[in-house]
Amino acid sequence: MKLFDLSGKVALVTGGNGGIGLAMAKAIGEAGASVVIAGRNNDKNKKSVELLKSLNIECISHIVDVTDENSCNSLIDNAVNDFGKLNILVNNAGTNIRKRPEEYELEEWKSIIDTNLISMFTCSKRAFLHFKNVGGGKIINIGSMHSLFGAPLGSAYSASKGGVVQLTKSFANTWARDNIQVNAVLPGYIDTTLTRQARVDIPELQKRVEERTPAGRWGDPDDLGGTAVFLSSNASDYVTGTAIPVDGGYSING
């Protein structure tokens, strides 16, 4: 199991104070890494830190606005100052506004791209400078099954998540010789605050997803933990530029 041991590593998870981000932070921490949680809501940050510390995970948090380059740069630098280095970056911060294309205001549409895609560029660019100091690193970008499909009432979301996959491939191609592996995870329908609202808006969604998904159920945030540990560990040293669906088989069911 040493192949998956993250002892002595430092991981930063944006949007790490709930849902998929918190589940990944927990799994990475349980594998031995020290964890930095970043999010806009300081109360949620603090509660998440308390949870991880109760599991004997070394953890701190920072407030960040991932749509602001200076805030992202400060976050990365502060994480390094806190623990002396950075080895793993999980770009998980995300948002959505569900509307028909003609109903969006341009600023709403741009705000989704800024949060879901541009923030990954900004944080990864800064992290690269610190990864070079420790001989490499791991970047995990959180896409979506809607990286592969066009989401109804989600043109900005689908565009941003499709961009995540191509950004991941480009980073991987560029930074491979720097010993930096960059991969994407594409969650399916996971039971989070975001998807709970979707089920309110679309009452038939619950049953529809369960019927189409070979696993026969919605995912739990903890279902993402194993993939996060794999992509953070030495076990994935020869894996880069991939986009791994974690969706109970939804995406193979055409």
Residue ranges and their predicted role:
Residues 90, 176, 181, 239-241:
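Short, small/polar-rich loop/turn modules that mediate ligand/substrate recognition or access, typified
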Residues 144:
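Residue(s) in the substrate-gating loop at a strand-loop-helix junction
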Residues 129, 173-177, 237:
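Alpha-helical segment proximal to the catalytic Tyr-Lys
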Residues 1-3, 149, 228-229, 240-254:
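Short C-terminal tail/terminal secondary-structure segment
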Residues 124, 160, 168:
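Active-site helix of classical SDR
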Residues 10, 17-18, 41:
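Conserved glycine-rich cofactor-binding loop
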Residues 100-101, 105-113, 205, 209:
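Substrate-binding pocket helix/loop in short-chain dehydrogenase/reductase
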